[in-house]
């Protein structure tokens, strides 16, 4: 009888421990700070990502040099835009494909060369799977998230006027110069604007 009682007690304790571990598993992400390693030469990006996902949308400060190999440095004063692919912590520049930069109001022309914006650091936040920031100069709040294969951008325009989204196909996180896109075309469906 004694061994049966001990076995039942051990089984009950194992079930309680398993249930407790399973219940607490989802709460562990509250301990994650995606900004750790984003300054200096940590080569980490606060991009939104899921484990083993194909995309990681996040901010890019620059596309040049070893110190910016993730595309992001916390102390950099401006954001160039938001690209859809990043490698975090690798120490070598790669990806940074298809940079997007939203703005409200008439800001850019065909002759414009600087599309960057200063982020409001008080509004910049990241948690596993989500990145957010406000760009006051561009009149937009940016929210990025990811699924296994899709980068999702949401832009909330805080200023009236003309809304623009720059799509930069030449941007990429690489060492050196040279063409990244050698041939491209674009068209606008006149019926849809």
Locate each region found by the language model.
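Positively charged n-region of N-terminal signal peptides that target proteins for export
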Residues: 1-6
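Bacterial N-terminal signal peptides
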Residues: 7-17
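Accessory carbohydrate-recognition regions in carbohydrate-active enzymes
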Residues: 22-193
């Amino acid at each position: 009888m004694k061994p049966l009682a001990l076995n039942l007690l051990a089984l009950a304790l194992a079930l309680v421990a398993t249930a407790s571990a399973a219940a607490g598993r989802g709460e562990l992400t509250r301990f994650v700070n995606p900004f750790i390693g984003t300054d200096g030469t940590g080569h980490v990006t606060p991009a939104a990502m899921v484990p083993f996902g194909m995309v990681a949308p996040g901010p890019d400060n620059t596309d040049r040099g070893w110190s910016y190999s993730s595309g992001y440095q916390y102390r950099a004063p401006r954001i160039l835009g938001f690209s859809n692919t990043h490698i975090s912590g690798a120490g070598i520049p790669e990806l940074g494909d298809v940079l997007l930069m939203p703005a409200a109001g008439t800001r850019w022309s065909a002759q414009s060369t600087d599309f960057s914006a200063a982020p409001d650091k008080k509004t910049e936040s990241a948690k596993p799977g989500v990145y957010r920031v406000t760009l006051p100069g561009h009149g937009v709040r940016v929210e990025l998230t990811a699924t296994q294969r899709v980068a999702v951008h949401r832009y909330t325009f805080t200023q009236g006027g003309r809304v623009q989204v720059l799509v930069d196909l030449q941007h990429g996180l690489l060492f050196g110069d040279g063409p990244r896109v050698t041939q491209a075309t674009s068209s606008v469906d006149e019926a849809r604007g």
